[in-house]
Design a protein with these regions (language model features):
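DNA major-groove recognition helix of helix-turn-helix/homeodomain DNA-binding modules
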Residues: 45-64
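Short amphipathic recognition helices of helix-turn-helix/homeodomain-type DNA-binding modules
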Residues: 63-73
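A short, Lys/Arg-rich alpha-helix, primarily the initiator
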Residues: 1-14, 52, 62
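Short alpha-helical DNA-recognition segment
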Residues: 17-34
Length: 73
């Protein structure tokens, strides 16, 4: 199963966003996105919900993202 760090990176790449652009969209710092993607910190539940809401608002279904990624391995 895809972990949160890989999910953040996958969503960001699908939307063709830089870490800085994603950070602005989520109202967090660039450093925060970088730390999430590199597994240096675990985001709070609130931050994770914000990310999932962002995905939903951008028409990315997280469960299907997980399934799609598993099929490409």
């Amino acid at each position: 199963m895809m972990g949160f760090p890989n999910m953040v990176k996958e969503v960001r790449q699908r939307l063709k966003l830089s870490q800085k652009q994603l950070a602005q969209a989520l109202s967090v710092s660039y450093t925060t996105i970088n730390r999430w993607e590199n597994s240096h910190v675990v985001p709070s539940n609130l931050a994770q919900k914000s990310f999932y809401d962002f995905c939903e608002n951008n028409f990315i279904d997280v469960p299907s993202l997980l399934t799609d990624k598993e099929h490409t391995k």
